[in-house]
From Swiss-Prot:
Coiled coil: none annotated. Residues 75-93 have a biased composition (Basic and acidic residues). Interacts with MinD and FtsZ. Residues 74-93 are annotated as: Disordered. GO terms for biological process: cell morphogenesis; division septum assembly; regulation of cell septum assembly. Keywords: Cell cycle, Cell division, Septation. The lineage of its organism: Bacteria, Pseudomonadati, Campylobacterota, Epsilonproteobacteria, Campylobacterales. Belongs to the MinC family. SUPFAM superfamilies: Cell-division inhibitor MinC, C-terminal domain. This is Probable septum site-determining protein MinC. Cell division inhibitor that blocks the formation of polar Z ring septums. Rapidly oscillates between the poles of the cell to destabilize FtsZ filaments that have formed before they mature into polar Z rings. Prevents FtsZ polymerization.
Amino acid sequence: MLKTNQKNVHAFEIEKQEPEAVIGFLEKNHALLQYFLIIFKYDIESEVKAVLRKHQLLFLETNRVLNGRHIKTMPLKDETDHPKPNHSKTEPKTTIYERHIRSGEEIYSTNHLIFLGNIHNGAKIISEGCVSVYGVCEGAIVCFGECLILKEVKSAQIVFQNKILSLKEVEPLLVNKNIKIITKNDDILDIKEVL
């Protein structure tokens, strides 16, 4: 008997664009895109394929119409032409989760997120704001905010400000149950332990 697994996949569909715009998007967002399938609605150029392979991103070239729920986004060209918003005026809100986040659960948010329960293995958290986990963290965390606060870490799947933490960088997080605050200063990762 053939062994198969069924999976639900989140995907980005990219319409025909200038290769430079697509490469810029991929370079800027490759850490986030690790968790998605990228579907190109055209035959992509070799330089775009090189960037996809460099970052080990999953992609598909097809002209076939795919069914699924669509989330409305701005076209890539318009998105890259907009000036960056002034974050001091539009501070993200904070969402607090008092429950455990179970395996298979995915949370995508523009808010700051606080988790009082555990993040189980197989759960995925992606936030544009700061993330604080005061329970056991076994799942994947992708944080684009100014800081990441973790207590008891049992996962090596952590991305902070577009940087995938290496096993060497994750090791200091695994040693005890003290609260650790992760920040970045000029691309240098800073981990402080709070007793």
